[in-house]
A protein has these predicted regions:
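Conserved donor-binding/catalytic core segment of Leloir-type glycosyltransferases
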Residues: 180-197, 203-206
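Short alpha-helical donor nucleotide-sugar binding micro-motif in glycosyltransferases
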Residues: 241-242, 249-254
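Nucleotide-sugar donor phosphate/pyrophosphate-binding loop at the beta->alpha transition
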Residues: 64, 106, 116-134, 172
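N-terminal strand-loop element at the rim of the active site
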Residues: 1-7, 11-62, 152, 165, ...
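Short hydrophobic beta-strand element within catalytic cores of glycosyltransferases
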Residues: 279-282
Length: 354
């Protein structure tokens, strides 16, 4: 169940839609997503998908999500409700509480980065944390997708006994190794064009770099109201959201992936890129250092520091990027497999209590 699934949340849902090998007959899955994002769940049978009308993150859309969720809970009688992201978690758990005289599903909640991890005022962080502390009492298991998120949540008062660490995982890729070549260095950004994803940091950094051999492709669009403008720039190509197969093709053509986020749960985009042999140029925010190690699988710069990112873009060279990408591919194979993520998630579905 999700209030919005654009980006990494959709990838996670698609991945865990495949039950553990040999165990598919034990599960019947139903999904609730925005009707204009249903196509993000390609590969999932349409009869399993329920939708609601969403025009943005506004009160009417949130009320429609709550109403549709209550309908699904009453009709489908699920044993487990898995809520993805903060707004879904708040609304979904409130709906479940209201329906408890009639329906009592186990509640699994994955915030994909708690709201109190965002860059915001201390007052807002305290309010967000208070809401999560209250709602944890009606939550059976909270999935944290990074050690950073789990430790930070514990410091904000979320009980460790309710939390379970499950890293996002990715299916292994067996594509041919990249070759250095003599073409310009092709950089890639995939994600929402907003403040959280640090898209403004990337634009400022790229504008500072005095290199004619760099090309940047930006894939994504605004989802929330805090979107960043996309000014026309030399050597920058803007693309809307594309299909997963098209994203894979872009990964294959790129020389490096840029992830300048200000906060993350545990981003799927760098996992996808590393699985394709791409080095990642990432900020040091929240969970990203658990995935990207400086001068090992990519480059790491201080979050929000566009000059530091520009400095990295000034020094990168193709042969070194190839070496970093190959190391990153090995790290993903060893530590972040889809099979492990699926098995751990379904273990919670079977016994989602602490």
């Amino acid at each position: 169940m999700a209030e919005t699934i654009k980006g990494g949340v959709a990838t996670v849902i698609r991945t865990i839609s495949a039950s553990p090998e040999g165990d598919a007959a034990n599960y019947e899955l139903v999904y609730l997503v925005p009707e204009d994002q249903e196509k993000e769940l390609h590969g999932i049978a349409p009869p399993q998908i329920r939708t609601f009308a969403r025009s943005g993150r506004n009160v009417p859309s949130l009320l429609r999500f709550a109403w549709r969720l209550s309908q699904v809970l009453i009709k489908e009688k699920p044993d487990v409700v898995h809520l993805h992201s903060t707004f879904s978690g708040v609304i979904g758990r409130c709906v479940c509480v209201l329906l408890r005289p009639w329906r009592k599903p186990q509640i699994v909640y994955c915030p994909h980065a708690f709201s109190f991890l965002m860059e915001s005022s201390p007052t807002k962080q305290k309010v967000y944390a208070w809401i999560e502390r209250v709602l944890q009492k009606v939550t059976d298991v909270i999935i944290c997708v990074s050690q950073y998120e789990l430790d930070k949540a514990a410091r904000f008062g979320i009980e460790r006994k309710r939390m379970k660490l499950i890293y996002n995982g990715i299916h292994h890729k067996d594509d041919a190794p990249k070759a250095a070549g003599t073409e310009p260095i092709h950089l890639l950004f995939v994600g929402r064009l907003d403040y959280q994803k640090g898209f403004d940091v990337l634009l400022k950094a790229f504008a500072k770099v005095q290199r004619k051999d760099l090309k940047l492709t930006v894939v994504g669009s605004a989802v929330n109201e805090d979107s960043v403008d996309c000014p026309p720039m030399d050597s920058v190509e803007y693309l809307p959201w594309v299909t997963p197969s098209e994203v894979q093709a872009l990964y294959q053509k790129a020389d490096a992936l840029i992830v300048p986020s200000r906060w993350e749960g545990f981003a799927m985009v760098p996992l996808e890129g590393m699985a394709m042999g791409l080095p990642v140029i990432a900020s040091n925010c929240t969970s990203l250092p658990e995935l990207v190690t400086n001068e090992v699988s990519g480059y790491v710069f201080p979050s929000g520091d566009h000059q530091a990112l520009a400095d990295v873009l000034t020094i990168i060279q193709k042969p070194r990027l190839l070496d970093l990408g190959n190391e990153g591919r090995s790290i993903v194979r060893e530590r972040f497999s889809a099979a492990l993520m699926i098995r751990q998630t379904y273990d919670l579905y079977r016994a989602p209590t602490y």
